[in-house]
UniProtKB/Swiss-Prot annotation:
Residues 89-114 are annotated as: Disordered. PANTHER family: UPF0265 PROTEIN YEEX. Keywords: Coiled coil, Cytoplasm. Pole-localizer protein involved in the regulation of several cellular processes. Disulfide bonds: none annotated. It is found in: Cytoplasm. InterPro entries: DUF496 (IPR007458). This is Pole-localizer protein TmaR. It comes from the Bacteria. Belongs to the pole-localizer TmaR family. The keyword Membrane does not apply.
Length: 114
């Protein structure tokens, strides 16, 4: 019986660890979504700014700088999107492990009662 209790305790600790991991991943994904949204707004801002700047108003290099900034923001959006996909995969894996562990724990308790 002591072996079952020790294993049950280890299972509970592992379950708590996975639950915390899942929550941390969820927070990271929400943070990435905010970053994606912020950078998409910056892209729109720079597009609008680029429409108003004319060559007779300023030098052509300003357009190059703006385009460079826009490309940088687009790259960031892509990077955050990829990171979000990776986090989502980790979260799904943690959920699957938690379900398996919960099922195994229930089976262990069921066998211990016999």
């Amino acid at each position: 019986m002591e072996i079952v209790n020790k294993q049950s305790f280890q299972d509970v600790l592992e379950y708590v660890r996975m639950y915390r991991l899942k929550n941390r991943i969820k927070r990271d994904m929400e943070d990435n979504n905010r970053k994606i949204r912020d950078n998409q707004k910056r892209i729109l801002l720079l597009d609008n700014l680029n429409q108003y700047i004319r060559d007779d108003m300023t030098i052509a290099e300003v357009r190059g700088i703006i385009e460079s900034m826009r490309d940088d923001y687009e790259s960031r959006v892509d990077d955050y999107t990829i990171r979000n996909a990776e986090l989502s995969k980790q979260r799904r894996e943690a959920s699957t492990k938690m379900k398996e562990q919960k099922k195994a724990h229930a089976e262990l308790l069921k066998n211990a009662e016999k």
